[in-house]
Regions:
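Helix-adjacent hinge/juxtasegments
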Residues: 58-60, 70-76
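Short, intrinsically disordered, charge-balanced linker/junction segments flanking boundaries
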Residues: 66, 118-122
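Active-site neighborhoods of divalent-metal-dependent phosphate/nucleic-acid chemistry enzymes
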Residues: 73-119
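Structured helix-beta-strand junction loops
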Residues: 33-37, 70-71, 91
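A generic structural signal for short hydrophobic patches within well-formed alpha-helices
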Residues: 13-14, 45, 120-121
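Short, well-structured N-terminal submotif of metal-dependent ribonuclease cores
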Residues: 1-40, 52-63
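Histidine- and aromatic-rich ligand-binding microenvironments
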Residues: 8-9, 40-41, 94-95, 117
Length: 122
């Protein structure tokens, strides 16, 4: 059976690293699922890596770097991706970063998008 192409939002990775509470348990369950092939983007990297690098949190940095080393593909920023994100944001009222994540997931033909956002958010 083919693996699900799963785009992981930054909130899921942040929760998994913190490893406390129900959200963390759910995040770790998704990340530990061998039936998934993970996809991410430059934008998720930008959301997660700068602070642990700046403040010397090596454990957090290594956690994220290990994840990013194993995603396929890592969707890269491009003018076309930004245009697609703008259309997405205008169509459903997303914030800029959320729209970039959705556009990246669509560009990578993901089967699902896993986020820590509330289900009521567009």
């Amino acid at each position: 059976m083919p693996q699900l192409r799963t785009f992981i939002d930054s909130g899921v990775l942040l929760a998994a690293f913190k490893a406390a509470g129900e959200l963390a348990e759910n995040a770790l369950a998704v990340l530990g699922d061998a039936e998934r092939r993970f996809v991410s983007s430059d934008f998720v990297r930008l959301e997660l890596l700068p602070k642990p690098i700046c403040y010397g949190n090596d454990a957090e940095r290594l956690f994220y770097e290990t994840f990013f080393a194993n995603v396929e593909p890592l969707v890269q920023a491009s003018a076309l991706l930004v245009e697609a994100a703008e259309r997405e944001a205008e169509a459903v009222g997303l914030s800029a970063m959320d729209a970039l994540h959705i556009a990246a997931a669509k560009q990578a033909a993901c089967d699902e998008f896993v986020t820590a956002e509330k289900s009521t958010k567009p």
